[in-house]
Amino acid sequence: SFNDKKVYYLLLIMEKSKLIWLNGEFVNWEDAKVSVMSHTLHYGTGVFEGIRARDCKNGTSIFRLNDHVDRLYNSASAYNLDIPYDKDVITQAIKDSVHLNELTSAYIRPLVFFGEGEMGLLPNNVPVNVSVAAWSWGAYLGDEAGNNGVKVCISKWKRISPESFIPTAKGVGGYMNSTLAKIDAVNNGYDDAIMFGDGDVVAEGSGQNLFLIKNSKITTPPIETGALGGITRRTVIEIASSLGYETVEENITKEDLFNADELFFTGTATEVIGVVSVDGEDIGTGSPGSITNAIRNNYLEIVNGNDPISENYLTLVK
């Protein structure tokens, strides 16, 4: 079973809001219900996004909103889910979910899923449902992770092969794989896990992209390993370039991990977090490194609206 302290923390960080947008209208959180016979509940046939809104100086703003909406539609198309709303409708629902719930900072979860219809793998005569929830959610890996970094293990679970699923899409069913890795890591006293793909090369964390730094060279696994084409990943590559560091997509081995000067995770929920040990072995100095910290600080300046280029990435909620 889970370590009690870890379970308490995981349950504590989510605060329910008042309203959820469901199929074109806002309903009370408690009334946002679907049938237990929903196709997605049985077969994992859904897609989702994770988006953050922050309390910026010009007002509550959402980071890379259009990119997230684009990926939601691309993910849905890849999994044969025909979203019954235009992008403008979903974009407005996302903004309204933050505004109507009176949130200044929020995590936002659009979800596209098959409802109840004919049972069986082939979703015949099955409606496509869409929901958007927004709530106050703190640091995914803990409040101290930004300063102290996280301790991870190499997971016994391999990342699903890109020949078996679509790594560029955020498919609901694929996260069973991630959940196995996360549970196993926490049960063994770690904060998270690094997952390998085919060919014994690194793919990503349980739900984050991974970057490695050696001799000031930044490397991240290519998408072909099964890594998600993360929006934060893309942002970090842009930030690294602005700081004078080129990022290359290259295979990373187990040996590379232990010889790294720095490692860090990226993701919308995770943000930019240093990985300070792997399987109990310190990485570099055993603390988040200088390049990791520089990228993290720049990232936080941008997403909080404090950088001159922030306006290129942020959308005001109201």
Outline where the language-model segments fall.
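Short, internal active-site loops enriched in acidic
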Residues: F113-E118
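Hydrophobic, Leu/Ile/Phe/Ala-enriched alpha-helical segments that form helix-helix packing faces
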Residues: F2, V98-N101, A240
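Short secondary-structure junctions
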Residues: H99-A106, Y245
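N-terminal amphipathic/basic-hydrophobic helices that include classical n-h-c signal peptides
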Residues: S1-I13
